[in-house]
């Protein structure tokens, strides 16, 4: 019954967007442009070395429908998504742009982490690295200002700790974000991107009976959500504030692609409790067996997919540690390889192999290495 209910909700939202678009199309003032957007990410996974009895299977990793509209200097985006048996509001924001500047307000990603802010279709692998999943945030409600030139990108914002699909009965915390990117080399098929981002955040002040008040949680499902267990998790209670810093490196050279990040989260805790630090990093590279070069999204300073039809070979190493200050969140290392075929700018087939090395205080499973093969098809 739950699945039927979710299906009916998503069908209603889909019909509402499509009906609205038809009505709007008949009454559009001159200069307004809009388009219906969609995304379909289907994944399947098989665990090859499987001492922990992980379940093989398939899933809709992401299913979306939405609309984009532009009018003069204004832009708007509204997108609904279905994943993990939940219907949720994804992006919901308006943007005003003037020359090289823009102001964005609504619900969207905070300006932190290359792998988090880029489109899921543009990811090299079926899933972001554990360091990114654990140490970054999803979309939040807020306002941000950005400025860009050929060689620089700057973004700063103010966000509440709230999203439209997970409203909290709480006095919401807030976050102040900043991101700076320098591109000493930026020309056709060649790019050097060096970035630095930081966030200062306060925890939610929830109701007195809520055990999770003043708590920051960091967690990761490992390398796949086919078996959706949380393998590494740290709940840092008695938190006063949090400071995150992230460094970025992105290099393009014709068929070659290199991307890496280091992320560190420091939690200042109340008197009598030891401060906590979590950290993680990843490094990935790609080579185009077919195709010529990679795209780059200058508006948000993040990597894109290969241009046109392409065949891509990828490799990635990820490390994450959530053990500190007596909190045993766990550690993980994993090595992944991928082969991606981009049929066109809308459709791609991705084959991934990941080898997971659990460290101390891993959750849910024994400290035994395992591997998984995933295949996914993306339609945007």
Question: Which residues does each predicted region cover?
Answer:
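Ser/Thr- (and often Asn-) enriched beta-sheet segments in non-cytosolic proteins
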Residues: 24, 33-35, 70, 277, ...
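Short hydrophobic/aromatic segments of transmembrane alpha-helices and their interfaces
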Residues: 6-8, 59, 135-136, 330-331, ...
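Glycan-binding loop/region signatures in secreted carbohydrate-active enzymes
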Residues: 35, 191-193, 200, 204-228
